[in-house]
Amino acid sequence: MDKMSKWIVKYRNMILAVAIVLLIPSAIGYFNTNINYDLLSYLPSTSESMKTQKILGDDFNLSSVDFLVVNNKTDQEAAKIKEEINKIDGVEKCIWRDDVLDISVPKQAIPESIQDMLYSGDSTMMIVTFKEPTSSMRTMNAISKIKKYTKDDCYLGGISAISEDTKDQTEHDTPIYAGIAVVLCMIVLFLGLESTIAPVVFMLGMIFPIVYNFGTNVFLGEISYITKALAVVLQLAVTLDYSIFLLHRYQEEKQKLPNEEAMAKAIKATFTSITSSSITTIAGFVALCVMQLTLGRDIGIVMAKGVVLGVLSTIFILPSLLMFFDKTIEKYKHKTILNELHKVPRFVIRHYKKILVAFVLIFIPFGYGQAHTNIYYDLISGMPGDFASIIGTNQLKDKFDMTTTHFVLVDDKLTTNEIQNMCSEIKDLKGIHNVLAYEEFVGPGLASNFTPSVVKDIFQNGGKKLIVVNSDYKAATDKLNTQLDKMDTIIHKYDKKGMIGGEGSMTRDLITTTNTDFAMVNVLSVIMIFIIVALTFKSFALPVILVLTIEFAITINMGIPFFTGTTLPFIASMVIGTIQLGATVDYAILMTTRFKEELSHGKKVKEAALIAMEKSSVSIMTSGFSFFAACIGVSFVAKMDLIKSLVILLARGALISVVSILLVLPSLLIFCHKFIEKTTKNWPESNMEAKGE
């Protein structure tokens, strides 16, 4: 690394020039990366609901379905609206009553079940199907055009419409999130660093890995809107301490060496230090990639890539910036507020046993709270009430009793009698509002100019028959999941291969999938961190102690919502623990490394712990408070509950982690020092008492 460090310093201006040029293709990549706003599309393709969605898309042209509520319009005006919607690119078909019965015929001639579905007082409903899935930009653009055309007393409801509103909100909010995170991180850096200019230089340096990370996402094809919204905040919070370490080491080396030699030494020391800590952070994000819900892979890859790019930028690009602004950095200085702690370390040394007792007593109730925190899977409930799509979805519920729509697929070889009997049994289930099948359109008593052949194309394709079932229950509730289970039983009585699609079925699969993912990701992330720490320190005891300390912080963080009565979004329980584990392990490694270093210098156990706490405290607090500031700032402006909940948990987790590392970790290091000595290769032997005790 000596030669590499000297090469970086020698060619620093050329490296910076190349880095600036690389921003151009990265920016192009960013603007060409698709964003997925449909979280349900991340379900495994092997799940029944996703298989059903594929058939609905391939055979029935129902890749994406929304419902348009048209208020206070005549049938003639409604027909005109439908005609214009059908002209919009991306719309497969807008389906209304005139597809099967001319509007000159009184609506009373329509079967009662169809009347109930299409009319409610002065309102009527149209079914809008799209050529491509919900997450497609073509579908998003089509929805945007529909909303612009029908803005007068018409509301589009459904998952696709909600996704389009989410897109608009995210595109508006993401730059604001980034701006707030940068400003608040800089404020924390001003409090913790003597140099007034260094925080600005750090932010200039962070531009490179952030832009590179977003630009290289183009190779993934697409990323989720959650990843897009949080990536800047997380990358800033997780990798900023690498920059701080390089600056501190450079300033230290400058006291005894010329600037270029000092920077070369600083680069080498920084690379050695941040490589081990960054690997643990990367491992935490990589653990997300094993999730069946591929949203985890999406977040995991982007954030792991962001950490790698953060390390590379710190080693290759930041040295050039620090040396370019060197005189300015040294010239403008101010008094810091975040200084080394002295009273807290002494308190820990005196009361470490009491701290550990408190640690156990706190862990138990919060562990219970974490296991019993309420989780919501309903993607609609976390959206702002002023979204046009939410207003439309609520109107579907209030006016047409269409809270959730199920799409049932059965073999087209089933007889009319079997279909009617099956529909009758489904209608009798509690919470079913109505059932619509092709068989409703055929039979005696219908108008002579009724055209069932048009309807047949909608309800029968690809060897399957489609049955539409409207439920009074909300998706992701126990009532709806029980209803789906009973529907499965009825359907499979007539067709063993019968399937149910739609939001309700997909959300049921989401619950099943995430329950498995949650346990798997947590276990894997702990194992990966354990192995890396064990290899780093060549120890068995230290990974146990470090992971236990961090899991304590995670348990407190995830247990608090139980006691406050807060319901968390499903994604929080899967990703927060992993992110907090990956970010916090850096602090733990920093303090443990300093503890070992002081022991190797002949210090007693308590004295070594005291010095480790004092010398590590500023770095830990600056990094942790930066993480907190970046996330808490976003929470004040985030309108979507899913984003807001995630950043609040991350912000609170950062503070809890700082406290845990400063209080619990040194207490465990002191208490377990003999265990550490016996299970760690080349660990310095030492007695307990500090000098003067």
Question: What positions do the PLM features span?
Answer:
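Structured non-transmembrane domains adjacent to transmembrane bundles in polytopic membrane proteins
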Residues: P44-D66, V70-S163, N374-L542, L548-T567, ...
